[in-house]
Amino acid sequence: MDLLVYLPLLACSLLLFPVMLTVGREIAADACASEISGFQHLNSTGLHLTLHHPQSPCSPAPLSKDLPFSAVIAHDAARITRLTTNNPSRRPTSLHRGNKPVSNQVDDSLAVTVPLTPGASVGVGNYVTRLGLGTPTTSYAMVVDTGSSLTWLQCSPCIVSCHRQTGQLYDPQASSTYASVPCSSAQCSELQAATFNPSACSKSNICIYQASYGDGSFSIGYLSKDTVSLGGSSFPGFVYGCGQDNEGLFGQSAGLIGLARNKLSLLYQLAPSIGSSFSYCLPTSASAGYLSIGSYNPGQYLYTPMVSSSLDTSLYFINIAGMSVGGNPLAVSSSEYSSLPTIIDSGTVISRLPTAVYTALSKALVAAMGGTPHAPAYSILDTCFKGQVSKLHLPALDLAFAGGATLKLKPGNVLIDVDDSTTCLAFAATDDTAIIGNTQQQTFSVIYDVAQSRIGFAAGGCS
């Protein structure tokens, strides 16, 4: 019998139904137990999952609060490299081990690897939730990622390597609904578009995937199917990656849930049952948010159109229309806002703006903050102040998008504490691709309505 039949089936069925669990802003560590009891529920609009900040004490896969902010900067750099180079013309056409090509016909020992460079492109700036998978169902702590398509997680027996994770590995032998995906399947053919890496085929005709990231982190394993069960409902045949060689810094998560625009993403696979929209509220480390898949209340949002880009059709692009500080528009031509394509992303921490826009924003903020003492630059963050954001008085800052949607940013959406005595503007300049990251999205409800090709924003989403 093929080895794959025995591999863990951890399908990241993270998004299953519309999710809208709300939690109080301040969550003490001793309140986490009661929060877990309401982790997921099903109502008339679908399933609601709790979403955690990576450094929340209630996170199922928490990161150390002692993690230096330089690690976040490194994570962002690697992630942006991946997001902005996910183009078939820029990627290899065969699996590689280091710089040596590997045959696309491999044996069941999964002797296909890539460089073992430790990475930080998953699990530092991303948000975490739990998913149920298999029959009987077991739940796993998973990173939520709008910039990835394929859902994957670590599977027993970890033929090559697995990083340390919270909880046990998924064992496919324990699931009566597990199945491997053959090389001749349509899902195997879709891997190139989903991962920008080609698939391989085992000698027993099992499809092998490779998901790689900008800093050398990767997951390689068998493409698999199993049942995702959440909120009392089950979805059979969910396709995901069962990782047997997982290298890099993925925190303590079991794997990653892909929410990008591709046939293999969780959203697209579940769309026939629950609809092609999802929403979330990204919480601060002191609160909890939610992830929701399915129907939603359209009246609570202000919308901006999704736009297409040749950079990567699986990512979510929008257009920035303007910015203002203290009610005054930035001193920059309106054409500068649309000079670069703009991605909205759940995993990038520091947003990137076209250089002219960033320069105008920095000058306007410094002028508006008057005598606030300046601090030295921190890595790429060159507009810094002494103190912490909670102690400073900031002017109103609005971020407007095409179509009329506007984010009225709070201080914590504008500045980010990099250490105990320094806070910096949570934007940086770029001449490549602009990105609206998760710092600016925190505490807002954000809806991705793929069916109507629009993204909506509403204030107070996590409260």
Which positions does each model-derived feature cover?
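Aspartic protease catalytic domain
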Residues: 2-63, 70, 134-136, 144-149, ...
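Low-complexity, highly charged intrinsically disordered N-terminal segments
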Residues: 43, 47-100
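Signature of the N-terminal lobe/flap region of pepsin-like aspartyl proteases
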Residues: 78-86, 91-92, 96, 103-238, ...
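Aspartyl protease catalytic core from the pepsin/retropepsin fold
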Residues: 129-139, 181-266, 321-323, 327-332, ...
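Cytochrome P450 catalytic domain signature, combining two hallmark sequence patches
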Residues: 159-186, 274-276, 301-309, 359-379
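Extended, H/D-rich, highly charged conserved domains that either
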Residues: 261-264, 272-296
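Active-site gating loop/helix substructures
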Residues: 296-331
